[in-house]
């Protein structure tokens, strides 16, 4: 079974952080939080899930902050989430299955990112994002805004999805 470090960058996310972390607490092996200057209860909430909380001065560059978060990871793979992302129950199960069966030669796992919903909560817009990235494989985030990792090596398209929920359901 592979191990996974959750690597997050946060700032003033007290309204959504707990929901996010609760949805993945039993799935990941390590939680890394890089705080870029919160002035609310974000840090306090994060301490209920991890003691690996690092300050990083904001540099107008999301990739710099994400790379900082990944630099603290010690597990086989790094996973990123934004504080307003969640794993739904069916995706939690699919993720655990992936952890048990993933071929360790896979460098990047792409996962659907559900970001648009109709009035009934059904997904209306989804696209694949690099979600699990092999740790220390030489890949890094690029782009000050709309940052990405260019997949290198073996890429797997997964069954688990990440759901973007701006506010509490």
Which residues fall in each region the model found?
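N-proximal low-complexity "stem/linker" segments adjacent to membrane-targeting elements
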Residues: 1-23
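Catalytic-site signature of metal-activated, phosphate-bearing donor transferases
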Residues: 3, 64-70, 76, 87-169
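Residues at the starts of beta-strands that form the adenosine-phosphate
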Residues: 3, 29-30
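A conserved acidic beta->alpha catalytic loop
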Residues: 23, 27, 35-47, 58, ...
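Conserved beta-strand positions in the Rossmann-like core of class I SAM-dependent methyltransferases
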Residues: 32-35, 54
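Conserved donor nucleotide-binding strand/loop of the catalytic core
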Residues: 44-72
């Amino acid at each position: 079974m592979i191990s996974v470090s959750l690597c997050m960058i946060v700032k003033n996310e007290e309204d959504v952080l707990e929901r996010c972390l609760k949805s993945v607490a039993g799935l990941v092996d390590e939680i890394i939080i890089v705080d870029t200057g919160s002035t609310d209860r974000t840090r306090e909430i994060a301490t209920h899930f991890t003691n690996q909380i690092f300050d990083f001065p904001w540099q107008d560059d999301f990739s710099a902050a994400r790379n900082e978060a990944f630099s603290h990871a010690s597990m086989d793979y790094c996973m990123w989430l934004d504080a307003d992302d969640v794993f739904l129950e069916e995706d939690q199960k699919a993720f655990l299955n992936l952890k048990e069966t993933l071929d360790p030669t896979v460098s990047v796992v792409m996962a659907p990112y559900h970001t648009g919903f109709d009035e009934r909560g059904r997904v209306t817009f989804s696209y694949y994002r690099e979600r699990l990235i092999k740790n220390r494989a030489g890949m890094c985030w690029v782009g000050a805004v709309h940052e990405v990792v260019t997949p290198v090596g073996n890429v797997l398209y997964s069954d688990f999805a990440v759901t973007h929920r701006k506010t509490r359901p």
